[in-house]
Amino acid sequence: MAGGQELIEQIRKELEPVEAQLRDHQYVRALEQNEIARDSLSVIVGEQHITIESDLRSLAAMVARCDHPRSRRFFLGTLPGEDAAFGALHDLATALGLDEPWLQAYEPTPEAQAYAHYVAWLAHYASPAEMATALAVNFPAWGANCGRVGAALREKYGLTEEATAFFDLFSGPTPSEFEEEVRRVVDDGLHHGVGEAQLRRAARLLQSYELMFWDGVYQASTAQ
């Protein structure tokens, strides 16, 4: 049986076709070419506002469910970053003229919210190893796209670094410390009977829902 790190690398290899679609997504390319109307930037803000708020609650729910201290520490450690991102997202909303009543009234698209709904399912029904694997496989493409989106918003739409800090918080490669903590959580899960098929399924579905997120944002942004 493969260890945690080896298994994660295998899963990443298996999901390379989806990874490639994420890293060459038409929404990100459209932003870089200034093809998304400025008023339509509200779509990604509205969708992310719902997603991050949901993810915060999902991660907190997983913390409460964790029986092993190592898993609990790992998920607890993700909360400050998510909370900081939620605050930074409000700065972006303000820069675009979107206030709190607008954010609360925003009507999400089903495609863009599939990701957050599956994270909530993982938090309540899956093992810590499944959720950690899914997040670890997902983060590289998400981070790469965030880096490009933040840069495009500054270069093509004139937004400041402060306004685009939400995307900068997620940009760049996954920290090695995060990878090591995931490996330990996955190793614990494998040791306690979590099957490799369960880990593969969680990662495959979350990565597919990530692609649906970008598809939904693009469709809603270009329909306006």
Positions of the model-derived regions?
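Active-site-proximal alpha-helical scaffolds that flank and shape metal-associated catalytic sites
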Residues: 70-173, 208
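Short, charged/polar, low-complexity loop and linker segments
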Residues: 27-33, 188-192
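Acidic, carboxylate-rich catalytic segments that either coordinate divalent cations
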Residues: 2, 193-224
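Alpha-helical bundle segments that constitute or directly flank the non-heme di-iron/ferroxidase center
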Residues: 13-23, 31-65, 130-147, 207-214
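Long amphipathic all-alpha helical oligomerization modules
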Residues: 172-203, 215
